[in-house]
């Protein structure tokens, strides 16, 4: 693998080149990775280390000893140049380019494009086309506000895409396009729905210039399956490892994703990005305590960070940590209240307090700022479900599916909404879609099983199959075991029912739980064993029932009387005459 100093030099040059082309998101990402590289001890100075203060929970997690050794890569990297190769036309920026860049920075995109209309260098062509693309996006957003229908629906499109595709494809045919132009060409093709050509263009872009994270991100959005990901012909470079870590996470291959980030820790030991990505993977694995610790550590190192904090708010919401969520909402609101993430966090806070109308208002505000903000669409759908407004919930979930067809939460939400409407056939369709994207989640199998149990379907055998899958997927709440026992009991399969009641009882004993499910299991097992003349075993369960008060205790006494009578063959005396 390349050395830390080599990576550092590459990134420094890349930041300048990306910034020169107004690719500010990619430049910001590169800058964060630059300060995430651990400094050599000989170079430790206050200026070098001020972004690397404090311990990192992610670093502690991956460290096996005090000194961090660079892990050996699974594949060999071809040695890249010490810095990105400069284009021949970037040595001296022309006066017109400097003016156009100034207009671009002031968001005057059409002026920037017009200034460069006669400039033919690759750098100028890219900035002109990029400015034109953003001008079209800006106008599209304005039209969406002017013409929007329910929940912001609009048929507005970027009217510059056709001319941009024509020009960029011509440049590609003649070889007069660089890696940045290929990136923009891929974006345009993706917007027009030509995903196959878009992938090819983006692969060509990242292979010729691997430091543009925006190109990698666009490519990742087009990798909707592991088959597509594996088919990409990508050069070996350390940036590819960042891409694979993120792509694996989106494909819910969390172990593989974590392995990539562990590998990258060898050089980028202080990367806040890697820590946030690792927290996302742990969140998907429902390791909420670990995720909370990691986000707390992240905020200590980067206290004004808003990015990814919406995920942190989801963790606090799931843990019902109202005080911590209130603090986080207040903090991000003061930092940048017009960020979609900030609005989403405040929406989560109001949802936790049961103020669903206010929550919807903030999720709507988040969507005003970013129409493609997936979490806001899904969470707004959840709020409408809580408000029993199923039609609005369905609309919100459908918009989430439009943004990301691979998001299981939106499909699951649609299933829940149709189930509430008493339409189990529709609900089943959407639950199946959610399971396709997340087959190892017990909650989804349980939801589908309940559909099969509904009065309209009454397909109990199919429900049993789903509950068995839920058990195999690690149903921590024990819903599946209890339902399997009840279904087998209902179908007259008492041996199978006894098996699952016993398993459920073992689970409740291990977790120290009590309640109606335990009483139900004890009564069934005692009765079943008594019927099968296993009196000693039946007595054990009856004795446990005597620890209850009220009707449970009376039921136990009745069972014990029956057991004694069956054992002796004589009518039993009152229980008070027997020592218990």
What label would you give each PLM region?
Residues 104, 133, 190, 249, ...:
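Position-specific recognition of the canonical hydrophobic site in helix A of tetratricopeptide repeat
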Residues 22, 107, 136, 193, ...:
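Residue-level detector of the short coil/turn that links helix A to helix B
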Residues 92, 121-123, 178, 212, ...:
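Residue-level recognition of tetratricopeptide repeat
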Residues 95, 124, 181, 215, ...:
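TPR alpha-solenoid repeat register
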């Amino acid at each position: 693998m390349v050395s830390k100093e080599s990576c550092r030099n590459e990134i420094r040059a890349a930041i300048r080149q990306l910034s020169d082309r107004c690719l500010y998101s990619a430049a910001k990402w590169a800058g964060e990775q630059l300060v995430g590289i651990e400094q050599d001890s000989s170079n430790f100075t206050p200026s070098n280390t001020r972004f690397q203060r404090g311990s990192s929970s992610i670093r502690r997690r991956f460290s096996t000893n005090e000194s961090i050794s660079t892990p050996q890569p699974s594949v060999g990297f071809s040695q890249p140049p010490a810095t990105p190769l400069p284009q021949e036309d970037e040595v001296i920026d022309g006066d017109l380019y400097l003016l156009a860049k100034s207009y671009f920075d002031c968001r005057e995109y059409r002026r920037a494009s017009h200034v460069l209309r006669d400039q033919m260098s690759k750098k100028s062509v890219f900035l002109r086309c990029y400015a034109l693309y953003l001008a079209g996006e800006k106008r599209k957003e304005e039209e969406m506000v002017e013409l929007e229908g329910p929940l912001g629906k609009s048929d507005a499109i970027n009217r510059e895409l056709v001319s941009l595709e024509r020009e960029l494809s011509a440049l590609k045919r003649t070889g007069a396009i660089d890696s940045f132009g290929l990136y923009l060409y891929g974006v345009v093709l993706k917007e027009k729905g030509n995903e196959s050509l878009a992938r090819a263009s983006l692969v060509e872009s990242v292979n010729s210039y691997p430091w543009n994270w925006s190109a990698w991100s666009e490519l990742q959005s087009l990798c909707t399956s592991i088959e597509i990901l594996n088919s990409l012909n990508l050069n070996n470079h350390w940036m590819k490892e960042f891409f694979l870590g993120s792509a694996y996470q989106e494909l819910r291959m969390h172990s593989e994703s974590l392995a990539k980030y562990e590998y990258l820790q060898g050089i980028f030991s202080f990367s806040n990005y890697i820590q946030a990505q690792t927290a996302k993977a742990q969140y998907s694995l429902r390791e909420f305590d670990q995720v909370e610790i990691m986000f707390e550590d992240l905020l200590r190192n980067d206290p004004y960070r808003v990015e990814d904090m919406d995920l942190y708010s989801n963790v606090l919401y799931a843990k019902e940590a109202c005080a911590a969520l209130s603090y986080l909402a207040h903090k991000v609101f003061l930092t940048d209240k017009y960020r979609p993430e900030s609005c989403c966090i405040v929406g989560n806070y109001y949802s936790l307090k049961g103020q669903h109308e206010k929550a919807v208002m903030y999720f709507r505000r988040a969507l005003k700022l970013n129409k493609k903000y997936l979490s806001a669409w899904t969470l707004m759908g959840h709020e409408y479900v809580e408000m029993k407004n199923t039609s609005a919930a369905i609309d919100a979930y459908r918009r989430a599916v439009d943004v990301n067809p691979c998001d299981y939460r939106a499909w699951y939400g649609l299933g829940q909404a149709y189930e509430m409407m008493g339409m189990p056939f529709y609900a089943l369709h959407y639950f199946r879609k959610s399971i396709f994207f997340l087959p190892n989640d017990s909650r989804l199998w349980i939801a589908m099983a309940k559909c099969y149990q509904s009065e309209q379907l009454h397909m109990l055998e199919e429900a049993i199959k789903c509950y068995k899958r839920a058990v195999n997927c690690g149903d921590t709440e024990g819903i599946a075991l209890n339902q399997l026992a009840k279904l087998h009991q209902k179908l007259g399969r008492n041996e199978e029912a006894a098996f699952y009641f016993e398993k459920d009882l073992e689970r409740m004993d291990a977790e120290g739980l009590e309640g109606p499910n335990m009483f139900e299991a004890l009564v069934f097992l005692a009765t079943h064993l008594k019927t099968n003349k296993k009196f000693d075993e039946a007595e054990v369960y009856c004795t446990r029932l005597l620890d209850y008060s009220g009707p449970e205790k009376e039921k136990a006494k009745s069972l014990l009387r029956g057991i004694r009578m069956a054992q002796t063959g004589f009518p039993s005396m009152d229980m008070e005459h027997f020592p218990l």
